Structure formats: structure tokens, C-alpha cells
Amino acid sequence: LLATRALTEDELYLNLGYWREANTPEAACRALVCLLGREAGLNPADRVLDVGFGFAEQDRVWLSEFAPREIVGLNITASQVAIARERMCQYGLEGRIDLREGSATAMPFAAETFDKVMALECAFHFDTRADFLHEAFRVLRPGGRIAVADILPEPPAEHRLTRFHQRWT
């Protein structure tokens, strides 16, 4: 758990990070957040949807680095939403980052509502990724962009052994 997350007093990242130049977990996590923001082309005119925001650490970074007009977060885990809202209040960002509880596969938003839809290392939790992408395209404005940093977990070891056995016996 601690090897894959940067949990410090000030930062609650839940991503694996981008380690090209980083030398600490916190720096790597922030680097991945910034990389995704750059690849998405975040800018001050954007209305951004962050799906599966965890503790919304990336939303704070995107707000400070790219200054989008608005960030709305959607997360299915009530305890994470509560903690993230409390943290945004502590940082004075409750009016700038709107965090909501809801599903990535049944988004409570009208069609063509957002300029950018972001998902930072959370899509592997969605049931299913295809349903998430369908919803993401539905809420995306024409000309908008979806930016996803994803993880593809390996199957359990016993599954790999079974496949190996089937292939070679």
C-alpha cells in the first residue's frame, strides 16, 4: 500500500507516479498529474470533469498549474468524497472544486457538459471501462478531450500458471 501511494500530511495522492525525473513518491505523483494535465490540454476556458478523483489531490494541482474555469469531481466512494471535500475547505477551494458522489458509468450530468474528462489511474475500478468511456463521450462537448492514465493489472499468479500449463501440456 505505501509503496504505491504518496500519503503525507499535506498530500494524499493515490497514483503510482511518473518517475522520469522524480526522486520521491510525492514528486512522481505530482509529475503524473501534471503530465496528464498537459496531455489533456487543460486551460483557463475549460470546464473539467475528474472521474474517480480519490482525495482530489490532482484537482488542486490542476487548478494551480492550469487554472481551468471549473473542476467537477465524481467519485463513487463516499468516504473519499467526504475527506476530499473537507480538504478542499481547508485549502479554501470549496467554491472552485465541486466534488460529488456518483458513478463513472452512470454520470449524473447532461450531455455535452464538459470540455475535458479526466481519469487518473482509476479506470481499472470501473465496471466497465467501456461503460465509462461511453459516458465520458456523452458528457464531453464537441471538440473536447478525454485524458486517461490507466493501470492494467496482471492476472493473479494462479491464472498465469494455468495458462502456462494449458499452453505447454
Which positions does each model-derived feature cover?
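N-terminal, positively charged/glycine-rich alpha-helical extensions of SAM-dependent methyltransferases
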Residues: 1-17
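Conserved alpha-helix/loop element of class I SAM-dependent methyltransferases that forms part
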Residues: 27-44
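Class I SAM-dependent methyltransferase SAM/SAH-binding core
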Residues: 49-106
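A short acidic, Gly/Pro-enriched loop at the edge of an enzyme's catalytic core
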Residues: 105-117
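A short SAM/SAH-binding and catalytic strip from SAM-dependent methyltransferases
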Residues: 116-128
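A short glycine-rich, Lys/Arg-flanked "PGG" loop and its adjoining helix->strand segment in the class I
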Residues: 130-145
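Acidic carboxylate diad motif detector
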Residues: 148-150
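Short, glycine-/aromatic-enriched active-site segment of Class I SAM-dependent methyltransferases
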Residues: 152-169
